[in-house]
């Protein structure tokens, strides 16, 4: 593939490893040609265009308008006709209404910035309930945080780090998330409810203990004053 990259657009600097990274993402997506794919934080459409020939349709979303213009050009120069791109803040573009209008994704590929995904974006993804999510991250810490937020509904199917920046502590990490069965989801939600209830009870007991201690101290002080 050929790519046009403008001065305001993001592109992986290590092109050889970038190819390996995109191959891993495509492998994890396990496309058959029938899927509607959402590519979140698409940048110049590199992953979107890379997987397009394996999908029925790919929708890319990116915050930077100039990058989206590059993404459209990149589809054109590579004769790719099954992509659509939208520019705007992810939490404002990716909504339940957007999915109703454009179709429920079979697969979501997400490659957010170091800060990870906004909670509203995660909730919309959970509402959409795709069969698979491929999460590409340059920050394993925020990736782990986001995976925890999706743990009730998705399980980790595979993990593959890619050394994009040799001789540095930085790494790109690709995680495949697979939708849990209905029975598994029900059990996970039950366990979470029990944990939350236990935490609430422990907090209430601690507050009651503190109150009783304060009342006892006040009573002792009153007795001292009476003496």
Annotate the PLM regions.
Residues 1-226:
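Rossmann-like S-adenosyl-L-methionine
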């Amino acid at each position: 593939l050929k790519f046009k990259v403008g001065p305001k657009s993001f592109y992986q600097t290590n092109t050889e490893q970038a190819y390996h990274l995109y191959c891993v993402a495509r492998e994890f997506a396990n496309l058959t040609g029938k899927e509607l794919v959402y590519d979140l934080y698409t940048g110049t459409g590199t992953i979107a265009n890379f997987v397009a020939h394996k999908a029925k349709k790919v929708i890319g979303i990116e915050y930077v308008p100039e990058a989206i213009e590059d993404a459209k050009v990149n589809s054109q120069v590579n004769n790719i006709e099954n992509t659509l791109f939208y520019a705007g803040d992810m939490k404002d573009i990716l909504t339940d209404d957007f999915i109703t209008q454009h179709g429920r994704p079979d697969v979501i590929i997400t490659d957010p910035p170091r800060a990870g995904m906004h909670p509203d974006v995660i909730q919309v993804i959970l509402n959409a309930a795709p069969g698979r999510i491929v999460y590409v991250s340059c920050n394993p810490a925020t990736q782990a945080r986001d995976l925890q937020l999706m743990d009730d509904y998705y399980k980790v199917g595979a993990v593959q780090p890619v050394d994009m920046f040799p001789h540095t502590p930085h790494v790109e990490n690709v995680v495949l998330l697979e939708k849990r069965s209905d029975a598994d989801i029900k059990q996970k939600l039950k366990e979470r409810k029990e944990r939350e209830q236990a935490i609430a009870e422990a907090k209430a007991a601690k507050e009651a203990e503190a109150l009783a201690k304060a009342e006892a101290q006040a009573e002792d002080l009153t007795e001292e004053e009476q003496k």
